[in-house]
Amino acid sequence: DSFEMVFDFSDADFSGEPQEKSTALERGIVTHDFLGLLDFDKTESIESLKQEAERLVELNLLKPTAPEFIDFDNVLRFFSSPLGERIKNAEEVLREQPFRVLIDADKLYKDVRSSDKILVQGRFDLILKEADGITVLDYKTDRVRGDKLKQRVKDYEPQLYIYDLAAEELFEKKVSEKLIYFLEAGQLVNLKQS
């Protein structure tokens, strides 16, 4: 007999006053949608990124207002980085990959000693499958820097821990890297190094 709980992880970014929260949420959703849909071959310039956004609008994959919420400079900086180049040249990249896995309760809660499983569902922003393991990447659109960014990393660690467990369960392969990329700050944080 086992007890099942469902946790659904979403990564909306909330910060600031109510109006700012609404704008931050919209920016986060639109940016994630854009990163999940864009053609990696269209990431070489601001102009090509804007054209790609317009193409996705024409295909009704993005709302007509979406491009005004995308910071194309930040997206270009990401795809010009070593990680961006690695993603563009990878053999297998999964984007916006949904997951639904059962995870042992004792892996999620320190004080639990049982065989109960917890159903966890969510969506990976990006999975990079490579010979030496899996890289889990989570994009963040938070407008934070310095000490606030360090605190935000700590806030997101539990989410990435769940993603780590879910990816290993789902793909039956070791997670070699858990990455958070803060688009606004242009900063990559590796929470798990092999």
Please report, for each region that a protein language model flagged, where it lies by residue.
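Structural signature of nuclease core domains in nucleic-acid processing machines
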Residues: 1-194
